[in-house]
């Protein structure tokens, strides 16, 4: 009798742990990445769902910025191998560029 109770208790414990792990995974926000290299943003255009966190990583020699043309966000100087993250909550198109290098531009479309 005791053996059945222990097995049943362990079964419930395993199910609880698996459900809890699934809940934690489900709570993570979607993510996307942009690499800064060769004086370009790669990809230059990115489409994401609302709630997505975008990470820009500078793999170039000089520092760059990730600055919205509408001034809604600005990374400041991002040095080599450093990152800038922004979570996009609302739908819209967000154009951005590098303040140090005006030919560097990109776009995040949130749909």
Identify the residue ranges that each predicted region occupies.
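Extracytoplasmic copper-binding redox domains, predominantly the cupredoxin/blue-copper superfamily
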Residues: 2-111
């Amino acid at each position: 009798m005791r053996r059945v109770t222990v097995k049943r208790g362990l079964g419930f414990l395993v199910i609880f742990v698996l459900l809890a792990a699934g809940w934690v995974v489900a709570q993570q926000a979607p993510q996307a990445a942009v690499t800064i290299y060769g004086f370009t943003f790669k990809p230059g255009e990115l489409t994401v769902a609302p709630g997505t966190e975008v990470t820009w990583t500078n793999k170039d020699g000089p520092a760059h910025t990730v600055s919205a043309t509408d001034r809604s966000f600005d990374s400041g100087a991002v040095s080599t191998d450093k990152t800038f993250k922004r979570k996009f909550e609302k739908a819209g198109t967000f154009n951005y560029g590098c303040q140090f290098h005006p030919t560097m531009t990109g776009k995040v479309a949130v749909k």
